[in-house]
Curated annotation (Swiss-Prot):
The gene is blaGES-5. The class A beta-lactamase family has a specific amino-acid numbering system, sometimes called Ambler or ABL numbering and often misspelt as Amber. A multiple sequence alignment was used to derive a consensus sequence and then the consensus was numbered taking into account insertions and deletions. This allows use of identical numbers, e.g. for active site residues, despite differences in protein length. UniProt always uses natural numbering of residues, hence there appear to be differences in numbering between this entry and some papers. This is Beta-lactamase GES-5. InterPro entries: Beta-lactam/transpept-like (IPR012338), Beta-lactam_cat (IPR045155), Beta-lactam_class-A (IPR000871). Confers resistance to penicillins, cephalosporins and carbapenems. Has carbapenem-hydrolyzing activity. It comes from Klebsiella pneumoniae.
Amino acid sequence: MRFIHALLLAGIAHSAYASEKLTFKTDLEKLEREKAAQIGVAIVDPQGEIVAGHRMAQRFAMCSTFKFPLAALVFERIDSGTERGDRKLSYGPDMIVEWSPATERFLASGHMTVLEAAQAAVQLSDNGATNLLLREIGGPAAMTQYFRKIGDSVSRLDRKEPEMSDNTPGDLRDTTTPIAMARTVAKVLYGGALTSTSTHTIERWLIGNQTGDATLRAGFPKDWVVGEKTGTCANGGRNDIGFFKAQERDYAVAVYTTAPKLSAVERDELVASVGQVITQLILSTDK
């Protein structure tokens, strides 16, 4: 009798979970219709197992979200002793491209340290600092090689900034899928890809990101711990990837959207709305 009772309870729980996932999908499809958008979402646990998703295997332009795994590659080089965080990277005015606030600020000195460039790339989305790091690691091909090394067979970087943010429809260059990137986030933060010191530093940078107050974290409860890296592309691309801790559970998340008919502010609001849909799912399934 107890066995039958347990089976009934398990069946009820499974049915409730399936219902919440259906609501998750329905809510995202409604947003897509209302905003004339495509929305890709993947939420995974620390082991990379899927919690929920939508258009998970569809390719989207990475935009600046790749700057998080780029920083992870830099930390891996530091951890292995092939790089030093305090090494000075010399550069000139040719390194200043569109949106390079920190690179411009350090130009008078003629250099940034490796860690200064990595932090600027993550927290400010500084394109000049990003290109400086790409120069040091061996270019976009080295970034793609790192993706492969940590088990991501999908994500690819082909160009530097700002060209990699063109987001031309049908162009496979500089793209990823939500599930590939969510699992890359999980691998970096929870899978032992970096030392604990490096992991803690990059988590702190993500939590202190200065470009994402209006995106995912705007749609999450204030008591969740959230760290993220945004991305903006031409042709309506607005993305956000990272991690969140809800009710003592850790998750990695990747959200990629394309909404060419919306304004920049409306695209931020769209990503925040996706955050609200994710919140509803997590709070319902964690009861």
